[in-house]
Amino acid sequence: MDSSLSQKFTLAYASLLGVGGLMGYLKRGSKISLVAGGGSAALFYYVYTELPGNPVLASSIGIVGSAALTGMMGSRYLRTRKVVPAGLVSVVSLVMTGAYLHGLIRSS
């Protein structure tokens, strides 16, 4: 199966979120990080699987999820000034929001 570039970026994004949640749990014992990172990773893995067959649905879900993460982690960055994880996730999420918006426009 040949993956599109958008699928590869989505899979990398899901992996980043999942690994980040796991790291938060392992380093600080944060169950919230584990659940939030795992849940976000699962959502974006679903987007990854839906992109080839239903790009409008997948991109729509991707926009909502990545925009929510941009807002939440951006707010956290402004409050804590910690680049990792809040700054990193907010910037990557902002880029992914734009990518999903581009995909949605292109698919419509």
UniProtKB/Swiss-Prot annotation:
<dbReference type="GO" id="GO:0005739">
    <property type="term" value="C:mitochondrion"/>
</dbReference>
<dbReference type="GO" id="GO:0016020">
    <property type="term" value="C:membrane"/>
</dbReference>
<dbReference type="InterPro" id="IPR044890">
    <property type="entry name" value="TMEM14_sf"/>
</dbReference>
<keyword id="KW-0472">Membrane</keyword>
<dbReference type="InterPro" id="IPR005349">
    <property type="entry name" value="TMEM14"/>
</dbReference>
<dbReference type="Pfam" id="PF03647">
    <property type="entry name" value="Tmemb_14"/>
</dbReference>
<protein>
    <recommendedName>
        <fullName>Protein FATTY ACID EXPORT 7</fullName>
    </recommendedName>
</protein>
<feature type="transmembrane region" description="Helical; Name=1">
    <location>
        <begin position="32"/>
        <end position="52"/>
    </location>
</feature>
<comment type="similarity">
    <text>Belongs to the TMEM14 family.</text>
</comment>
<comment type="function">
    <text>May be involved in free fatty acids export.</text>
</comment>
<keyword id="KW-0812">Transmembrane</keyword>
<keyword id="KW-1133">Transmembrane helix</keyword>
<feature type="transmembrane region" description="Helical; Name=3">
    <location>
        <begin position="85"/>
        <end position="105"/>
    </location>
</feature>
<feature type="transmembrane region" description="Helical; Name=2">
    <location>
        <begin position="55"/>
        <end position="75"/>
    </location>
</feature>
